[in-house]
Amino acid sequence: GFCSVCDWIGSNTEFAYQTPDTALADYFAASVAKVQAGNALHRFGLLAKAVSYKGLSVLLNSKESPRGVQVRVDGLPTTPGLTLIEAPTGSGKTEAALANAWRLLDQGIADSIVFALPTQATANAMLARAEEFAVKVFGDANVVLAHGKRAFNASFQRLVECGQRKTSQGKEEASVQCAAWLANSRKRVFLGQIGVCTVDQVLLSVLPVRHKFVRGFGLNKSVLIVDEVHAYDAYMHGLLGEVLRRQKAVGGSAILLSATLPAGVRAKLLAAWESSGVDDAPYPALWHATQGAASCMTVPDEHRPERREVMTECLKLPDAFPNDEVVGRIIAAAESGARVAVVMNLVDDAQRLARLLRHEITDRKITIDVDVFHARYRFIDRQAKEKATIAYYGRNAVRDKGRIIVATQVIEQSLDLDFDWMLTKICPVDLLFQRLGRLHRHQREHRPAGFELPRCTVLSVEDEDYGLHKLIYGNTRVLWRTELLLAGADRIVFPGAYRDWIEQVYQR
């Protein structure tokens, strides 16, 4: 990988790397090569040094103070290794990971960061946060986005334009940019200072594809951060394990983030780093592994997550689709001012329900907005949907009236959304908890009457066949166990459920 990158730079026609009729010994003696190489590395966006670590508070808003796992970040070893952060949704894992990565950059253990996420929507949302981080940590940095539709991402194209634009003095006008050379190929995504990508871009480094060694070289020199590490299937976890083994072999570092990680998956990830944990693990926790037994840091009592109850009900319906009564309840909730999310497992079901809701609202001669968000849109339309979803249901949304969104799994993870009531089709317990992380996510003084506490309605099938749902999730046993727990409780109590429920469902 290193040799390929050197060859690409050395053979580029944009620079004249030698003076005609100059002896090779004189060429090196005059330091011409060193100067030219430095210019090329800067021009191509490969060279930038992070500023000294200034503390996690620099990454937080001025009114915020470190909380939860964040207070333990500065106690993590600044040595190459695997760090695993387990903490509830919305508890600041991302800032904790970025702060720890900054500490490793400051110690010279790495010179860049790669942030991998499960979906294009979450990668797009992370790009803006990466820009803010880059300004604080690098000052002048190249931020690269990599997924199959990045050419349609307006924010990334703006970074590319900033990289191409020059002032009259030949300096970049923007401190955050993406050099054209880096943007020309997704193979170079990990060669800038910060790479934001979907996780498949990382996994390609261990698959038999062209120039995989270039991706590997970029990863090995970076701090690799993988978000929502619980969200991948067995095949992807196998590939991720190989990525971690190679990262360890070259003395690299990795940070894994999850709110809902089964013990078996945690053990496999630690084993990939030739390390091990304990079965009866605390929660939340930060693990650091080099080799042998991983060290585990718990969160001080005063910073532990507050007890949080989500009121639940489980309804058995034909094909788990809302009937007339449930549709009426959804509309009534929105009329009372609630922001309601309905999460379907199939795009066709989401479209069908949205049509049904709009038809019923029209018949009642009332005005309620019904939004739809899924992965089947043209990408340019999907971007608009992402922005609208965050605008209407995010932290800074104006909540002057009720609203309904019918969505699929695209709102399940990493998006900063806040709902008063959620209805969701049956899904594995860890993914259910991710969905519940969008309920009452932010502190608000006033919630609509009847929704002062977070509420979730799980829609399940009438029989135990689960139909297409078992094909989506591939494990009927997990769905059945999840439903069994829901049927026996009228509420889920966090953070204890992150361990208790998940281990009961995923018991060996």
Identify the residue ranges that each predicted region occupies:
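Conserved Walker A/P-loop ATP-binding site and its immediately adjacent core
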Residues: 111-134, 145-151, 261-265, 347
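Conserved pre-motif I regulatory segment
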Residues: 51-86
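N-terminal accessory nucleic-acid engagement/regulatory domains that precede
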Residues: 1-58
